[in-house]
């Protein structure tokens, strides 16, 4: 059984990420893509608008083809992300960029020091690319 102080401490860590869609504290933007050698580099911009630093933020991403079929699954480490900081992360997918129609954030598998579920709930997503949707 958790004591009251421990519960309060856990809530203090998780609260910044338990936000409504209008007030998300953790934003992930698919900013651009670059093709090279049958691979597609996905460039993400991560905005941590909270006052909590993340040691780790692992996303389970699924790339779907333009026909809706699953192309690839990619486990990514987006962290560490300091509090009130914006960073860029790049990941390569073994597929041509023109084959990718959308990217699903299937799950958040790690979100230290918080809980993955709280990070997923408070995660805001966007894409600068009209032809490539990022969603959860």
Show where each model-derived region lies.
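Short N-terminal segments immediately surrounding and downstream of signal-peptide cleavage
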Residues: 22-41
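Short acidic/proline- and small/hydrophobic-mixed sequence motifs that coincide with surface turns
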Residues: 52-56
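Terminal connector regions
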Residues: 25, 94-136
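Intrinsically disordered, low-complexity Pro/Gly/Ser/Thr-rich segments with frequent PxxP/GP/PP motifs
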Residues: 64-102, 106, 111
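Bacterial N-terminal signal peptides that target proteins for export
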Residues: 1-8
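Asparagine-centered strand-capping/turn motif at beta-strand->loop junctions
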Residues: 44-51
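N-terminal signal peptide c-region/cleavage motif recognized by signal peptidases
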Residues: 16-18
């Amino acid at each position: 059984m958790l004591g009251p102080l421990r519960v309060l401490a856990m809530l203090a860590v998780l609260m910044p990420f338990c936000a409504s869609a209008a007030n998300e504290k953790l934003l992930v933007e698919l900013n651009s893509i670059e093709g090279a050698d049958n691979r597609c580099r996905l460039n993400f911009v991560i905005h941590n608008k909270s006052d909590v630093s993340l040691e780790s933020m692992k996303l389970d991403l699924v790339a779907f083809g333009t026909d809706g079929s699953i192309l690839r699954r990619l486990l990514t480490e987006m962290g560490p992300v300091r509090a009130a900081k914006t960073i860029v992360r790049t990941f390569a997918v073994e597929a041509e960029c023109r084959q990718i129609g959308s990217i699903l954030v299937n799950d958040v598998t790690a979100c230290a020091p918080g809980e993955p579920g709280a990070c997923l709930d408070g995660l805001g997503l966007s894409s600068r690319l009209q032809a490539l949707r990022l969603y959860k």
